[in-house]
Amino acid sequence: MAHKKGASSSRNGRDSNAQRLGVKRFGGQLVKAGEIIVRQRGTHFHPGDLVGRGKDDTLFALAPGHVEFGRKRGRRVVNIVSADTERAEKAAVPA
């Protein structure tokens, strides 16, 4: 019988912290400038109108407005529809 524990027991016992990736603000939600919309590795979502991209591919709002998810040329795109744009669209549509 062995008088020692398994030799690898002290080499185990570590785990990496979660990266907390994913969508932080969903479609229709109101955001302020600078708020993070999506944390990602690689460009799963691409920046659209009024959305910036950080060096770690994080998408963030460049202006206040509502978040809008869509597709452009087969890519998933995140846009910000500003309050000014919404007002202009409502004024242009006859009631």
UniProtKB/Swiss-Prot annotation:
**A GO molecular-function descriptor:** structural constituent of ribosome
Q: What is this protein called?
A: Large ribosomal subunit protein bL27
Per the record, where are the segments of Polar residues compositional bias?
7-19
Q: Where is it found, in Gene Ontology cellular component terms?
A: cytosolic large ribosomal subunit
Q: Which UniProt keywords apply?
A: Ribonucleoprotein, Ribosomal protein
Q: Known PROSITE patterns for this protein?
A: RIBOSOMAL_L27 (PS00831)
Recorded superkingdom: Bacteria
Region of interest: Disordered: 1-21
The UniProt entry's GO biological process terms, in alphabetical order, are:
translation
Protein family (similarity comment)? Belongs to the bacterial ribosomal protein bL27 family.
Q: Is this entry keyworded Nucleotidyltransferase?
A: no
What HAMAP family has UniProt attached to this entry? Ribosomal_bL27
Which portions of this protein are annotated as coiled-coil regions?
none
Q: Which PANTHER family match?
A: LARGE RIBOSOMAL SUBUNIT PROTEIN BL27M, RIBOSOMAL PROTEIN L27
